[in-house]
């Protein structure tokens, strides 16, 4: 079975007009940035299937001919660049019709399921909406939610191809798995330090999932995090215990630290200025400097940002300095997680075979 990418059309392959959400003329047809180079990189490994909801297609409000003209031009454009789609599957119904084929329902893909036409372990849904994520869950596969700023086509290709490596094949792959079970949480963390890829992260706290993904994405490694916590109380135990398990997994995956860079420092400048300095020293300590105006960002308590990094540093046995300034709490927290990921990327990179300490041990 070949790995398959089930790709949304409007808002993912091509721009979706925010006025009427219909591409019914050539004037509205616009490709998403970098989509063609990304698909050209991916086509050797994956086959492509378009899965799209087109509300009211074939009605007076959205005649079939109005749809066909820009759609056919789009398909011809992709084909002229060497990109073909095995199928184009379209639901023409409106939400109120309650059909069985509208995403996230899976009727459109029934033949793929019945005939085992896709590799469940290596296939993905790519789309810009939550319904695309839900479609992936219903199919039993993973999703990548497209966003032109945060998860663009360049990043999608990098994740799916796992092109970022830190080991270069010189040593056995650095992998660790940690299972942590308490009365409050049940957590499983897996990290692959020498390969990038799609991270599967589900803690039940959406903003926290996104932040953990930033660590792996900017750290240049792959990780899976599954957590079932006592969220009916609050997210404190989930965040704290995930940090402890992740820190333990990173520590185990790094191993005896022979040959690693050990140190990392990064200072990203955007709307927020985030500084991070890291030493995989074996001596846990943290200096954290950040002020937040809001109590929560989404479903995540801002006060848990410091607690997460403190728990992570002590579990990793690392020395960590973090500082951020800015106006938007969402961006400040995100910049800290990104900065930590970039710094960790430097520190875990293998540069030789020597122990990076005059003591001969870390």
From Swiss-Prot:
Keywords of the record, alphabetical order, are: Amino-acid biosynthesis, Cytoplasm, Histidine biosynthesis, Hydrolase, Lyase, Magnesium, Metal-binding, Multifunctional enzyme, Zinc
Q: Which cofactor does it need?
A: Mg(2+); Zn(2+)
- Kindly give the PROSITE patterns that the UniProt entry links to this protein: IGP_DEHYDRATASE_1, IGP_DEHYDRATASE_2
Cystine bridges: none
For this protein, the parts annotated as crossing the membrane are none
Keyword field contains Metal-binding: yes
Question: What SUPFAM superfamilies does UniProt report for this protein, alphabetically?
Answer: HAD-like (SSF56784), Ribosomal protein S5 domain 2-like (SSF54211)
Which HAMAP family would you find in this protein's record?
Bifunc_HisB, HisB
Write down the NCBIfam families for this protein, in alphabetical order: HAD-SF-IIIA, hisB_Nterm, Histidinol-ppas, PRK00951.2-1, PRK00951.2-4, PRK05446.1
Protein name in UniProt: Histidine biosynthesis bifunctional protein HisB
